C-alpha cells in the first residue's frame, strides 16, 4: 500500500500483484502491523479509509447501487443515519459480504434495477447511487418496512428542493408502480 494509491479506493490484491511480488508482501506486512485491514478476500483498506463515512461500494459489492437509507442520507433527504450500507443488487446474484462494514443487500429485478442509477463522487469514491427521484419512489414503495415517518420525511425533503423534477418523479413512479400512492402523498403536502 506504500506505493501506488488508487484514487482513495480500496485496494485489491490483484492490483498490488501487478506491481510485483515485493509490493504484495508489503501489503501483507501492513496487514500484520495493523495499518491495513482485510475487508474480505482480496480487498484491503487503510484504517483512514475505514474511519470515513463512505465506502468503496464497487470494491465490496461490484455492480451494486447505493439505495434506501444510504442514498437518502447522501442526497440529504433524511436526518436519520443508516445503521448499515444499503446496496441494491440484481436478483439472484450471489455476493460475499465482509464482516465490517455492515452491508444490507436488497435484491431487485433486472427491469427495476436500472431505473434511476447515476454515478457520483462521494468522499473521494466514485459510487453508483440512485438519483433523488428514484429514492423518493423507493421510500413510498417500502413505506411499511422503513416506517411512515421516514417516508414522509423523504417526500417532504424532496418537495422542498428547488431543483426537483416532478415529471421524472412521476415517470419513475409509473415504472415502479407507486404513482397512485405518491400522488396521494403529494396532494396532502402541496
Regions found by a protein language model. Give the residues of each.
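Phosphate-handling catalytic interfaces
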Residues: 77-190
Amino acid at each position: 500500500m506504500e506505493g501506488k494509491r488508487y484514487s482513495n479506493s480500496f485496494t485489491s490484491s490483484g492490483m498490488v500483484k501487478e506491481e510485483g511480488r515485493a509490493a504484495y508482501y508489503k501489503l501483507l506486512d501492513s496487514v500484520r502491523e495493523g495499518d491495513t485491514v482485510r475487508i474480505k478476500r482480496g480487498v484491503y483498506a487503510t484504517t483512514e479509509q475505514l474511519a470515513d463515512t463512505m465506502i468503496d461500494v464497487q470494491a465490496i459489492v461490484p455492480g451494486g447501487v447505493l439505495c434506501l437509507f444510504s442514498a437518502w442520507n447522501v442526497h440529504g433527504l433524511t436526518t436519520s443515519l443508516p445503521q448499515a450500507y444499503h446496496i441494491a443488487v440484481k436478483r439472484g446474484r450471489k455476493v460475499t459480504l465482509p464482516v465490517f462494514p455492515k452491508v444490507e443487500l436488497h435484491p431487485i429485478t433486472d427491469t427495476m434495477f436500472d431505473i434511476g442509477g447515476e454515478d457520483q463522487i462521494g468522499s473521494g469514491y466514485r459510487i453508483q447511487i440512485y438519483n433523488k427521484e428514484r429514492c423518493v419512489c423507493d421510500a413510498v414503495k417500502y413505506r411499511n418496512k422503513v416506517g411512515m415517518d421516514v417516508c414522509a420525511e423523504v417526500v417532504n425533503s424532496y418537495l422542498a428542493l428547488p431543483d426537483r423534477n416532478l415529471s421524472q418523479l412521476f415517470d419513475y413512479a409509473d415504472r415502479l408502480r407507486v404513482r397512485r400512492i405518491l400522488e396521494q402523498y403529494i396532494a396532502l403536502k402541496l
